[in-house]
Amino acid sequence: MTEDFEVNLGTGGEDNSSSTMEHRVLDSPPRVVIPEDTESPAKLAPNHGIFMASINKSSPAGKKSGEGAVLGMGAQSTKDNSTPRQNSSMLSTRVIESLHDQVDTLTSTNLQLTVQSKNLLDKLDTAQQKESKMLENSASLKHENENLVSMLNRKTRRLKDVEEELASHKKNHDSLEEEKTALQKKWESSSSEEATLRQQMEMVQAQYDALVDSHQYYKSHYSSQISTLSEQLENLKLEQRNYTQRVSDEANTFNAKLLEFDSKHANLQQAEETRVKYLESKYDSLTQQLDLPSWVQLYRESKNMVLEFAEKMKLKIPSDFETLIQDPELTALEAKNPNSNNAAALPLRVAKQRAGGGNATSTQSGTSGSNAAHGKRSSFYGGMASSYPASTLPGTLPGVRRSSSRRKPSSRVASDNSNSGDSSPIFPHSAVATAPRSSATAPSSRVSSTSTSSSTNHFAFHNNNSNNTYRKRQESTSVGNS
């Protein structure tokens, strides 16, 4: 601890009142407890000399005496330089006087300093006592301060904990406030919904009462209708039983008729199969009698001639003719008979004529008449054709005169011509009934009748009676020609 002390310097009360004393602030000595025996002068002597020297340097009397001494020494030196002998006595006297003055001054000063030092020692004792008390107070205050610091730390930690708890409680409070707000809104909405539901419940209750009343009404109404419908249902059941019995009787009758029809159909199918077999055998025999390669060769020559003529004359071939020559059956027949290019190698079959007989005579006369009538008709190329010799081979080109011989008629070709509705058949049955036909038309009709043999066979199957009659007549005609 630091204390300030004021030291008054002077020789007496007059000096203190008349002159200004110099004040010096001294630092307190270190905190060392001085024992009571420090008041002895022997122990204070070293420090007293140092203290007095500093006082002399700082006091004005000392300064004056020093200055006087210096002046005296200066004057003495000057006197010594001028008159050393005269001034030596005066100088010594003055030095002695000054020394006496200094001794008196120092004595008074010593007394004053002794009194002052005693006062200072008293003050030092009191200050040390105060310091010891203050040290004790400081120690107690320090201990109390430590206790207060520890308590403050505990309170600070407690305060932090309390602040954390306060923050958590604030968060909980905010969340509870939000939850309260949400619950308040939910309660308000639930209250409005409750009011709405009450209104709806009242409406539903009214509707339910109305439905109960209507249910009672409809129950009574429909119970009466159900009783009526049950009576009608009983009547309908009775009618249904009668109708079922009647239908079962009719079904039994129909089954008996159906069995009878099945037996008749089986017999008819068997007869039909027998007739088909007979027709197939007849068709095979007629196919064997028919000279098919010669007809194919004749068709090929006619087709080539027509195409060549149309190319030379620059004529457009009709679409019917193109369709005819592109017929798959005719193309297949041409492919099956690739070796029938020579007409002389495969001549057409002709029926032999008898020398006598009415049929032969009529045939010859009819043939000669037809040849005479068509002897000068137009040829195929537009010119007038002359009479051709009778030695022309059969199967020649169209436009030639036929010989007196006749082919053996085919029942298949005749049936095709009769079914197609042609009034003038290709192979005449007698000389009187034969109509003159152009030789250019006859080969194409024969070929077309041959190409449609399968379709006409089915048609002849359905027209059984007419075919049988025509077949018998054709057979009799062929027998007469032979």
UniProtKB/Swiss-Prot annotation:
- What is the predominant subcellular site recorded for this chain? endoplasmic reticulum
InterPro entries noted in UniProt: She3
- Start-end of Low complexity biased regions: 430-469
Membrane topology value: Peripheral membrane protein
Keyword Zinc attached? no
Q: Which family does it belong to?
A: Belongs to the SHE3 family.
Q: Write the protein's name.
A: SWI5-dependent HO expression protein 3
Q: Which organism is it from?
A: Zygosaccharomyces rouxii (strain ATCC 2623 / CBS 732 / NBRC 1130 / NCYC 568 / NRRL Y-229)
The encoding gene is SHE3
